[in-house]
Amino acid sequence: MKDVIRYLAPVVACAILALPRIADAQSPTQIPPSITTPDKVDSRLGTLEFKDGAPSKATLDKVYDNLDFTYAFRAFTDNMRGVSIHAARKGLQSIGVKDNEVLIFSQLMDAKSLFLTANADTVYTMGVLDLTKGPMILEVPPKFLGTIDDYWFRWVIDIGPPGPDRGEGGKYLIVPPDYTGALPEGGFFVARARTTRVFWFGRAFLENKNDPKPAADTIRKFTKVYPYQAGGVGTPIAEFLAGKVMLGSVTPPPPTVFHEGSGKVMNTIPPNDWTYFEMLNEIVQQEPATSLDPELMGPIAAIGIVKGKPFAPDARMKKIMTEALAVANATSRSLFMSPRDPKWFYYPGSSWMNYLFETGYEFETPIPLITREGAKPFPPTGYRTMDARTNFFYGITGITPGMAMRLPGIGSQYLFALTDADKQYFDGAKAYSL
């Protein structure tokens, strides 16, 4: 027994010595203040309250109202471009121009037609291609400057001097998303769209002492819109013999329908009232679910606009979305009329600006420099300048690399100003000299 006690004594002593260390190991860790949430937080939403980190009912209401507000705000600022092109299509439809038909302003534009950035000294032509039944062909005339954008106003391909026809005119074959059918080996400038409809537009320049008639006549003579027939022109017989494609007929295309736009009353400008969300829903229902980046589609879905589902916000959401719409419109208009980034202006202190030189047509990387050795691209920035994109599509129609090229005689270069030499906004009731 003594031997047992003699054996256990050191063990008990060791256990007693170890007790403080066990107690130390079980004591709570000091929590850094940086990872805790205070019981009360003062914010622009008011006082937010948390009990042991758990939000109160009043806090939940404030936070979720604000979250839904931000989603509705972004649905406007990030996606105005889609509603803008939808509004343009609706404007054309309002005067009877259907998809795959052509609108031409033979006598130039005037104030009866509401467009964002139309000029009054070029002959405009435009239309919408419906790709739901397959690829469409657009034939364009020589000396015609234009572009094709998809239904989220993303660039597809240029027409004319900046495009593959280089001002000589030609046939453009526009292919819808997920098309797996046969395509020609030659004879067409082929471009794939990410949406089932695309908007094309361009202009011809005045000749013969500012007479628009020669340009308008050339447009009517050469412009054609018609469906692509697989296995026809552009498909060699060898492809058929190899079993790769069925032969199609080689027949003249159906006549293109033209509509006169000069003097017509139409509105192509996107709205900033509740109809904005209704039009945004129409686009989402019309286009493939994958037609827009998921990050951009996320806020749209968060406010209840989801492909294949009814858009029916309750009274709470409608109130929040209406307020967000007003703030988003005010923000977009402020960005357009008075940008805060000094790099967007042509030189320090100037009212003249064009941020595409700084951001490029994708609002990410400046346009390349043109040197004696050729084009000198800038490295990608890795981020998109969101304010520039919001600014651009709020006040301008169309996007293309050709809108910011340092190449004379190829594309277009723009400088615009919204204030006079005294930095006062232009007044439509006054006359100004340059």
Where are these regions (language model features)?
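A compositional/structural signature for long, glycine/proline-rich flexible linkers
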Residues: 25-434
